[in-house]
């Protein structure tokens, strides 16, 4: 019978057709827009982590709550937990030391220096996909073990901080002296949607190490934190893994010494678990049934826990004292001959064939086994450069301890940004170059000083476009992921930023502002750069008939060149900045997607992005001085002309060539070219969400609102890195 017949039959019997069948009628079910249009612009990325998802409310102050924490008592509770073995997940050798170190490592290890995303800073290991990654098997148990402590201390300690602190306490409990701990990681309440984990659709899909340099990916296989411990694509070859190891650790900003220290230090304690084949392992937490209550990977092998546990499928114990810190990793690495073998689960690993049975069994004191290692552990012996470092650590355990302490601190704090964000009693005093250190303030400009400086800037001969452009160039390097970049430090005046193509305006404007700073000696160059933007915007608003005072918070400082890691700051150079109509490469995504990416890094909402682009276009802030997107006959006036003319049906847009990157807007009647535009301009008329926002500012009653909204969004960007104001 046809569908029509079925419907007719239902109606004729008086039954409601909408109450029949098993279709999912819940909210959000059914075919979504992205199913129809998979290339749909991800404007939604700008609306994540809003107050609507935060149960703590807008007034919650984590730094204030943390100050109430009994930090010593918390660490005491964590220490006690380490040896409080639970029957539902028994501790190896009666200690959770290795488990908690792995939890902290895998939380922090998703960080990628290329785009600043990932890392432990927001407690993302609680959410998909990380909570169910193949490399994170059994870390659901670690987080569940921590729950009674989190429940006890409540909002005085975030999950994000607790994960890392638990790893630190585990190291300390093993007899290791850590470098310190900085709290300040604030939880979010939903998964990060902006992190690009890769295009692969299957877990453990292999990537060539060279590809990692071209994309913001942290691992050589989908679903891993770093590299495949069995070698690239399960090759079992230690030497071939060297390139993959360097690529992944290098993407976190680690050099060879830090890489060796982290691998060896992380594998000095604990074990891997591979009691039987992976076919015994059930669904991950996201796919597990509701009664599992967020736990996954239930095993049908034996008891499923303890000696029967299956995690990675590898069954490796590296050292003779797996719950106490030692130098046995390097001693065993070089002392014995290693033969490739397989774990009970069938995974490739190595065994010390000429070693006695010196490794204690985790659950039976009467049993011992030979030392075992991962394929990638042996890379530290057989790669020539790694081998040199490893032998030095073998012969100088104190050098190894110092290197691991510093590398572990860097690993677990790399995405926290400047040290001004750190809180707690164990923050190290030493400034580290990867923290982008800043000097102490030299100036405290008064309100009178600021008024005089603004007058001097206004009289300097700089145009509105130049003043606004230089301020944006200074502040817009900020990345919300790892809190790097921004205007504080005036690193626009230093290498490498001063020489970036996108910052061409700096060559013209900075000499003027630097001379003014030296002459007045009342404020830092960083403050004067931002103040120039204030002057430019106030002039542009006044020209539009709106009198407005742009808020300005002095107190920025000027970094020195020796406080600036040129290689690491080079990663902040944009491949595109749609706010300035800049694009360096055409082989990476679309121009409009890169605009969204930039706005998301700047923590902007969709309305904030919209108003900033519209305002900057009419102020003529394109990086190269082009007229693309400058839809106005009165540049330098903070008007709504960009929106009004973009949405004006008098103009018809067509690409100028096959690249579809540059467009001409012609008068439909005369055929005359009126405007030119890029994709970063036209997207505000083509994308339905952005067009809806553009229409707000194109209305006749929107002018004053536009100016106020522009100023608010502008000030937000200028202050993104003002952690000294927290």
From Swiss-Prot:
There is a cross-link at residues 226-252 (Tryptophyl-tyrosyl-methioninium (Tyr-Met) (with W-105)). Formation of the three residue Trp-Tyr-Met cross-link is important for the catalase, but not the peroxidase activity of the enzyme. One of its GO terms (cellular component) is cytosol. There is a cross-link at residues 105-226 (Tryptophyl-tyrosyl-methioninium (Trp-Tyr) (with M-252)). Its EC number is 1.11.1.21. PROSITE patterns: PEROXIDASE_1 (PS00435), PEROXIDASE_2 (PS00436), PEROXIDASE_4 (PS50873). It catalyses: H2O2 + AH2 = A + 2 H2O; 2 H2O2 = O2 + 2 H2O. InterPro entries: Catalase_peroxidase, Haem_peroxidase, Haem_peroxidase_sf, Peroxidases_AS, Peroxidases_heam-ligand_BS. Heme b binds at residue 267. Pfam families: peroxidase (PF00141). The record marks 102 as: Transition state stabilizer. SUPFAM superfamilies: Heme-dependent peroxidases. GO terms for biological process: cellular response to hydrogen peroxide; hydrogen peroxide catabolic process. The keyword Signal does not apply. It comes from the Bacteria. Residues 1-33 are annotated as: Disordered. Its cofactor is heme b. Homodimer or homotetramer. Bifunctional enzyme with both catalase and broad-spectrum peroxidase activity. NCBIfam families: cat_per_HPI, PRK15061.1. Belongs to the peroxidase family. Peroxidase/catalase subfamily. This is Catalase-peroxidase.
